[in-house]
A protein has these predicted regions:
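Charged catalytic cores and adjacent phosphate/nucleic-acid-binding surfaces used
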Residues: 1-9, 27-38, 47, 51-69, ...
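General beta-strand structural signal in soluble alpha/beta enzymes
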Residues: 19, 45-47, 88-90, 144-146
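Short glycine/serine/threonine/alanine-rich loop segments
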Residues: 15, 41-43, 85, 142
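Divalent metal-dependent hydrolysis catalytic cores, especially in the metallo-beta-lactamase
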Residues: 6-27, 85-88
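Histidine-centered divalent metal-coordination motifs
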Residues: 23, 91, 151
Length: 232
């Protein structure tokens, strides 16, 4: 999404802080922060990253340097601790994204290092996902957060948190979680379809038609498998 849209939507929705958590890099977050500075915007940008470990996804907030994907959860958590980042577990339960969900055994093992865990993700495709996510947070007594996971313009401002004091740094964020108010938006499954179309268009524009062909064939084969399975 263009930076100008993100900034405009944050102004329209009265968002004071936004965490940018691109996959496996902080370059986008840093670039957006610099863009906001050039525009002399009052929006505060939290530098973050959604890191794909071999054990599932972990988010870091208030980061100062990249952490590559493909490491173990242990290595990733260690690197996040070195830079004083908030260690945040996204969507701890999600059938649609089960390949990216951090293993519960890892949550159990590193419970003392994890600062917060989502009890609701803005891209949940069913209400039951949120209930399961909340159960996991309660089971391990980890502070709960709401994750916007916004990729499209109408997702902005639907899932937000209101802090008693400004989360100016990692410590302020962690200390404010107990009194933070969570606002959960409605489920909108159409956003998943829009994201897939957007991704396909970007690949087509780049000229990588072999990748387009691979995605279409995979989709057709998956549908055939589901039909075959249902007909048994």
């Amino acid at each position: 999404m263009p930076f100008c849209w993100i900034l405009y939507l944050c102004k329209m929705k009265n968002i004071d802080y936004i965490a940018i958590t691109d996959h496996d890099n902080i370059a986008g977050a840093i670039a957006f922060r610099e863009y906001c500075k050039r525009k002399k915007a009052s929006l505060n940008v939290i530098i973050g990253e959604e890191i794909m470990t071999v054990d599932g996804e972990i988010i870091g907030l208030y980061m100062t340097r990249d952490i590559p994907g493909g490491l173990t959860a242990s290595e990733t958590i260690g690197l996040l601790k070195e830079q004083g980042a908030v260690i945040y577990i996204p969507h701890p339960y999600d059938i649609r994204r089960k390949k990216t969900v951090l293993k519960e055994s890892i949550i159990c093992e590193y419970v003392d290092d994890i600062h917060c865990i989502e009890c609701w993700n803005g891209r949940n495709s069913h209400i039951s996902y949120g209930l399961q996510q909340e159960k996991i947070a309660q089971k391990y007594n980890i502070k709960s957060v709401v994750g916007a996971d916004a990729h499209t313009f109408w997702e902005f401002g639907k899932n937000v948190m209101y802090f008693p004091k400004e989360p100016v740094n990692a410590n302020a964020f962690i200390n404010g979680l107990d009194e933070a108010i969570m606002s959960k938006g409605k489920i909108r499954n159409i956003v998943h379809f829009i994201t897939k179309i957007d991704r396909l268009l970007k690949i087509m524009i780049s000229g990588d038609f072999n990748e387009v062909r691979r995605i279409i064939i995979k989709k057709i084969n998956n549908r055939k498998f589901r039909v075959s399975k249902n007909n048994r």
